[in-house]
Amino acid sequence: MTVLIDSWAWAEFFAGSKIGEIVKTYVMDEDQEIIISSINLAEIYRLALDRFDEKTAEKRRRAMISRCYLIPVDEEIAISGAKFRHERDWGLGDALIYATAIREDATVLTGDPHFKGLNDVIFLGD
């Protein structure tokens, strides 16, 4: 099973929270194939810049890139994401991330309420 670790889950992982410990089991499992969208990378980088500094943002970027396959938003994902955004009351970022997971046949690991109840989602939130 390929897992797309969503920004919500990465934020918990980097915070070292209880839920982050669950995310860590996926990250540390060398047999686990992990992907991220370029949107996830941008969101976590921005979050680190907002809360910390560029050095921390770079450290987190390197950690993500060293462990995950980075899937850029291409034309197919952009169109699919736009359709998801049109059908649901989501932000475009979440729609692009979900479109990436669908295209790559991946399960989304997240606690973001937008993803709750969807197929191919491991939901970590309440």
Model-based region annotation:
Residues M1-I36, A48-R62, D126:
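Short, well-structured N-terminal submotif of metal-dependent ribonuclease cores
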Residues W10-A11, L41, A78, F115-K116:
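A generic structural signal for short hydrophobic patches within well-formed alpha-helices
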Residues I5-D6, I36-S38, D89-G91, D112:
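Histidine- and aromatic-rich ligand-binding microenvironments
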Residues M64-E87:
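Acidic catalytic patch
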Residues R67, Y98-D126:
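Acidic, PIN/NYN-like endoribonuclease modules and their adjacent C-terminal/linker elements
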